[in-house]
Amino acid sequence: MGIETADFGRTGHASTRVIFGAAALGAVPQRVADETLDVLLRYGVNHIDVASSYGDAELRIRPWLQREPDRFFVATKGDERTANGARAELRRSLDRLGVDHIDLWQLHSLADPIEWDVALSPGGAIEAAVEAREQGLVRWIGVTGHGAQIAATHVRSLERFDFDSVLLPYNFVTMQNSYYAANFEALYRTCQERRVAMQTIKSIALRPWTGRPHTRSTWYEPLERQDDIDLAVWWALSRPGIFLDSVGDVGLLPKVLDAASRFTEPPDDAAMTALVERSRSEPLFV
């Protein structure tokens, strides 16, 4: 039932290739969060990715870190773009998590060009991140983002600063966008060469809700059937060296973990094309 592990970039940590995306805990009670922990432990997941903006998620994780203090590689994210704002945001995250340091702190959703320049210039959030690393509050520094341009933006970010990790969307439908795919491949090569951990999201995204009732806590409509989720997860995991952040819905988490635990070989393009046609998948970003 275990999920394979791989070196998380240059950090020296062997992370499960499926990372728990803790956005799923943003609006659930502690009882549900604790049931989710039991699921993670059953599959051996050892890496948690949360954010200061994920509702109560940091608070929900706090008891886990007290109960299992050495089990998880802990990552959180901050949305502030100035150094002063980022310092305050990090202090708040540490307090909410109940820890004196974390493994990875990420500049969250860094896509807007003006925000990008502010965050990565003197007096920006990156200044606070480096300072926090020097003080032992964080061990590693990463950057995340969404959108059709984010792979290209991450390439620029790695030219500006030597980030230890990146995070961005990756699924079969998104990679049919030639612009995104070309920039993703360039980013992938850079990450492999420089031992930058590459985290991917939206593996089981189906399409935008577009007026349909929201039956899941994800902001997009996800795949639901286990066999469809199997194909999507296996396709993502078939790329060597990448990690998959799970899903922002606790009800779907067991399906993603189950799929990952049974991964042996990738589906071919014909199987993935059939999935797209059968499920009527649509891109989230254009």
List where the protein language model places each region:
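N-terminal binding-site loop/beta-alpha segment at the start of enzyme catalytic domains
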Residues: 1-72, 128
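Conserved, mostly hydrophobic/aromatic
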Residues: 8, 20, 48, 61, ...
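Glycine-rich phosphate-binding "P-loop"
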Residues: 19-31, 109-118, 210-225
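Active-site beta-loop-alpha junctions enriched in small/polar residues
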Residues: 23-25, 51-53, 77-81, 107-110, ...
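Glycine/proline-rich, positively charged
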Residues: 28-31, 42, 81-182, 186-196, ...
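Structured C-terminal cap/extension of enzyme domains
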Residues: 41, 46, 162, 182-286
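Alpha-helix-loop-beta-strand connector modules within alpha/beta enzyme cores
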Residues: 58-77, 125-136, 190-193, 200
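Hydrophobic packing residues within well-ordered alpha-helices of enzyme cores
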Residues: 61-64, 153-157, 256-257
